[in-house]
Amino acid sequence: MRLSQMLFVTLRDEPAEAEIPSHKLLLRAGYIRRIASGIYSYLPLMWRVLQKVSAIVREEMNRSGALECLLPQLQPAELWQESGRWDTYTKAEGIMFSLTDRAQRQLGLGPTHEEVITALAKDLIRSYRQLPVHLYQIQTKFRDEIRPRFGLMRGREFIMKDGYSFHADVASLKETYQVMYDTYSRILQRCGLTFRAVEADSGAIGGSGSHEFMVLAAAGEDEVLYTADGQYAANVEKAVSLPPDAVPTTYKTVATLDTPNAATIDALVEQLQCHPTQIVKNVLYRAVFDNGRVGLVLVSIRGDQEVNSVKLHNTLTSLAPNYGATKLLDLRLADAHTAQEWAATPIPFGYIGPDLEDAVIKADSQIIPQWIRIADRTVVELKRFITGANRDQQHRVGVNWGKSCPLPAIIADVRKAQAGDRACHDPTQHLEAARGIEIGHIFQLGTKYSEAMKATYTNEQGEEVPLVMGCYGIGISRLAQAAVEQHHDAQGIVWPLAIAPYQVIIVVPNIGDAQQMQAATDLYEQLQAAGIEVLLDDRDERAGVKFKDADLIGIPYRLVTGRAIANGEVELIIRATGAKSTLPLTEVVRYLQKEIAQQLAP
């Protein structure tokens, strides 16, 4: 392609809307343009990148035995109501674009396709002889993000590969799950990305187990915790660990002390000259279940630890049937302002104990009249600890679990693991932290959707049983931007060869020089004939502008038909390293063919 014939516009200044390097560079280099918040046009260079990523994904999915199809973007609400996710996606999380057609039927623009594919399986799969089967698609998805940001990382419209497998049993599911784990690893390796597969929370998708594939980058939204021995890695939402041992207190008896202005752990530690591991802090939440009932949650956790909201959400979801509900719609931290909605008397925030009375909860038919009390495992073994006295400006010391302060009946891991914690599999190993961008997510769904939607098959014994499912997603557009986030420098993008829009760019410093132009044109035609993807910068621009643009757009190999042409040579610059050399014109094609073949070899 000749750059003079391409719609190619670069920006010298960083766009004000962009926050992270990859977003800035994709805008500056003319790869994408913003149409509205979270909505982007993919310009010709970007479309070539996306096609290359899609091709790698498609090759590896086909290699795994999966079958490509295309599912509708517009989905009827009935399917989502059947699975029980309509309210979750349109009200609780609110991420689905929904609409009503002229016949007053509710529809949604698909953020994911579990319901559609399960309905298809229900209609098409009858016997165990048809199993296992794995279908996938590559298409545009939609999410009504509250705050779209970071360009293609968190947009309202994006390209994704999603696949769904159906099985006769869990053993078969696990086989395909491992195949997909290996497939995703190969995809990211072929795309030239450094990544880590980590244990993850299944979120609204559900299921018994899942892994995320994280591309490591400083600007990643997710925190990954891992051990140096390579035996453990997890998203911080899912991670488990052993916290530091608690320091014993010196208190012998229970006493109530005045602790003015000690509503925070730091202030209390300073005032009592104690250690945060000796404190039981108590955190309040307001939970809303899908039947409209409101639960007030009191979490007791060690003073040096933080509550993991995802783990707490999952714990409360498992408790939902106790309150006539099936799921949790909303969970928010309570404070003095929001407490006015449900508190019968003022709540002494900062001085709350695990035994705060139920009587402080306002009488209301929609509000559960008792605290949902949850103790994190870090507090269970504490003795003679410090905690709130349930009175403003006062704390109790020397407290033990028992009659005076009952241990909550619900004990769960709701703490946030952190770097420095000991690993569960080997306490001599300590967790380390890294930032990551979630590119892929694979799930063992089990029978969650098939049971809800009555998608069954007849097994070998002639029994009608639910299909066992797995699902597997990888973000195509997100992967492309993540590659830029991981591969860039001060001059611009440094594309991995496998997904670069072009493999070679030829720069003509002076198009008025007939010898330079003729050499460039000859090379251009020879490289094209050899099957090498080449871009010819034949614009009427200054040489400095062309060199800066070549660095900015990140093409892996640059050929310059400058002064060396007089000696029958061309300058070669490798974008990733900046290494420069000269090659005889007669050797250029052969050299690049060999280099590119070696880099793209499996």
From Swiss-Prot:
Its EC number is 6.1.1.15. PROSITE patterns: AA_TRNA_LIGASE_II. It catalyses: tRNA(Pro) + L-proline + ATP = L-prolyl-tRNA(Pro) + AMP + diphosphate. It comes from the Bacteria. The keyword Cytoplasm applies. Its main location: cytoplasm. GO terms for biological process: prolyl-tRNA aminoacylation. One of its GO terms (molecular function) is aminoacyl-tRNA deacylase activity. InterPro entries: aa-tRNA-synt_IIb, aa-tRNA-synth_II, aa-tRNA-synth_II/BPL/LPL, Anticodon-bd, Anticodon-bd_dom_sf, Pro-tRNA-ligase_IIa, Pro-tRNA-synth_IIa_bac-type, Pro-tRNA-Synthase_IIa_type1. One of its GO terms (cellular component) is cytosol. It is found in: Cytoplasm. Keywords: Aminoacyl-tRNA synthetase, ATP-binding, Cytoplasm, Ligase, Nucleotide-binding, Protein biosynthesis. Catalyzes the attachment of proline to tRNA(Pro) in a two-step reaction: proline is first activated by ATP to form Pro-AMP and then transferred to the acceptor end of tRNA(Pro). As ProRS can inadvertently accommodate and process non-cognate amino acids such as alanine and cysteine, to avoid such errors it has two additional distinct editing activities against alanine. One activity is designated as 'pretransfer' editing and involves the tRNA(Pro)-independent hydrolysis of activated Ala-AMP. Consists of three domains: the N-terminal catalytic domain, the editing domain and the C-terminal anticodon-binding domain. Homodimer. Belongs to the class-II aminoacyl-tRNA synthetase family. ProS type 1 subfamily. This is Proline--tRNA ligase. It comes from Thermosynechococcus vestitus (strain NIES-2133 / IAM M-273 / BP-1). The gene is proS.
